[in-house]
Amino acid sequence: MKIVKKTIAEFKVEYIQVLDEKGNVDKELMPKLSDKQIKEMYEKMVLVRTFDEKALNMQRQGRIGSYLQVKGQEASQVGSDYALNKDDWMFPLYRSSGALIA
């Protein structure tokens, strides 16, 4: 058997990184959020956590089918959702209930 290694495509992925691996913030890229917006996002994170705990309890009681927790991912889901425009699309997965709630 002969193994052939061949490059069929090369590409790069561009991304924006506000916070680097060492926790340093790029102040130019830091979003400008008002106190009201920050409070709204926090309230949504609390709502997501509350829903998550309720759904997990219902699953353990046999009242709903399989449920995978969002716990620990609230900020990433609410923050990502907050950055969407009204005409943007979202394709949620099994641990994306937080994005749907936000």
Regions found by a protein language model. Give the residues of each.
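Charged, compositionally biased N-terminal leader segments and the immediate start
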Residues: M1-M30
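N-terminal glycine-rich anion-binding loops that anchor highly charged ligand groups
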Residues: E10-F11, I16-D20, E43-L56
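A short alpha-helix capping/helix-coil boundary motif
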Residues: D20-E21, L33-S34, N57-Q59
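Short, contiguous, helix-prone interaction/anchoring segments in small proteins
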Residues: S34-E43
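Cofactor-binding active-site loop characterized by glycine-rich and histidine/acidic residues
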Residues: T50-E53, N57-A102
